[in-house]
């Protein structure tokens, strides 16, 4: 069993994980965006859950609204990015299956836990 406290601080932060999955937070400030057409995870599916704020996700060129309670699955190799179109921080809890990053928050090559 692993336990982590979810704290939303600006940027991307790994919370916890094991060889099969990983949890992280992503906070995007108003008017800012992260990711884009070159942002993919070759070796991991990514689930995002919007805790608060609003914006949009662009996945393989299609735009989807993000609001509190949104849950989206981004499959491995799908290009994606997120934009905060609201007035408050966009707080996202994200899960990778399998892990996509090492402890230093560097992306892992496909197939490496």
Predicted regions mapped to residue ranges:
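A short, N-terminal "cap"/entry segment at the start of jelly-roll beta-barrel domains
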Residues: 1-24, 30, 35, 104-113
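Short, conserved beta-strand element in jelly-roll/cupin
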Residues: 27-28, 40-57
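Short beta-strand His + acidic residue motifs that chelate non-heme Fe in jelly-roll/DSBH
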Residues: 36-37, 57-58, 74, 80-86
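Short acidic-glycine-tyrosine-enriched beta hairpin
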Residues: 62-76
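A generic "binding-loop/recognition-motif" signal
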Residues: 43, 62, 78-79, 88
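Cofactor-binding loop segments of dinucleotide-utilizing enzymes, especially the Rossmann-like FAD-
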Residues: 52, 60, 95-97
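Double-stranded beta-helix
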Residues: 3, 83-113
């Amino acid at each position: 069993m692993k336990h982590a406290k979810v704290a939303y601080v600006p940027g991307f932060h790994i919370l916890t994980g094991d060889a099969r999955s990983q949890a992280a937070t992503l906070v995007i400030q108003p008017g800012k965006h992260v990711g884009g057409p070159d942002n993919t995870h070759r070796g991991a599916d990514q689930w995002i859950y919007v805790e608060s704020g609003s914006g949009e996700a662009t996945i393989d060129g299609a735009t989807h609204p993000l609001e509190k309670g949104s849950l989206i699955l981004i499959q491995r190799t799908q290009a994606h990015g997120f934009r905060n179109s609201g007035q408050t921080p966009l707080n996202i809890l994200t899960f990778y299956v399998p892990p996509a990053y090492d402890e230093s928050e560097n992306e892992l090559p496909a197939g490496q836990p």
